[in-house]
Amino acid sequence: MTSKIFSPKISAVIESLRKLPTIGKKSSQRLALYLLDKSPETAIAIANSLLDATANIKKCVYCQALTEDDVCNICSNTNRDDTKLCIIESMLDMIAIEEAGIYRGKYFVLNGRISPLDGIGPSELKLNILQQIIADRKIDEVILAISPTVEGETTAHFISQMIVKDIKISRIGFGVPFGGELEYLDQQTLLHAFNARTNI
């Protein structure tokens, strides 16, 4: 019914916005109409910034976080603790941990979890790069800050078995419920989770 209301170009904008996480039909319609009718200059600015970013953003050669340079700000920061490596699912987890101010080591961003049903295996998560980093660096602790979902448990187990080097492997714990996503935890809960991490 709504397809008869909107022109093809407006419908195309709505459908594009619907592809974004957490954006449903109504939200995509509201956003599209706002951008096209009330604030076309904002629409142009967003489009230009996205075009510029997609042309220039890449993944850090070490941690796999998004960056404009070959090495991201955290990996190139000599004040960070090189002996600690925190393995996370996404940059949103990195943001949550950094904002909580509870960790000063380095990261490795998986950009997902092992999920055979979705066609995501170790190679998609660049675990070969992670393995090389662990082999090359003087790391004394690997912290698995992975959400306790079924896929997260599978991923954490695979990584812990993959590490043959004699180093401490820990998992954040207290306050993270099964099925919970790390990025949604408040700072106090994250602090408890890091302080109560257990050895694997």
UniProtKB/Swiss-Prot annotation:
Keywords: DNA damage, DNA recombination, DNA repair, Metal-binding, Zinc, Zinc-finger. A zinc finger (C4-type) spans 60-75. SUPFAM superfamilies: Recombination protein RecR (SSF111304). The keyword Ubl conjugation does not apply. The lineage of its organism: Bacteria, Pseudomonadati, Pseudomonadota, Gammaproteobacteria, Thiotrichales. PANTHER family: RECOMBINATION PROTEIN RECR. Transmembrane segments: none annotated. May play a role in DNA repair. It seems to be involved in an RecBC-independent recombinational process of DNA repair. It may act with RecF and RecO. Disulfide bonds: none annotated. This is Recombination protein RecR. GO terms for molecular function: DNA binding; zinc ion binding. GO terms for biological process: DNA recombination; DNA repair. Belongs to the RecR family. It comes from the Bacteria. It comes from Francisella tularensis subsp. mediasiatica (strain FSC147). Residues 83-177 form the Toprim domain. The keyword NADP does not apply.
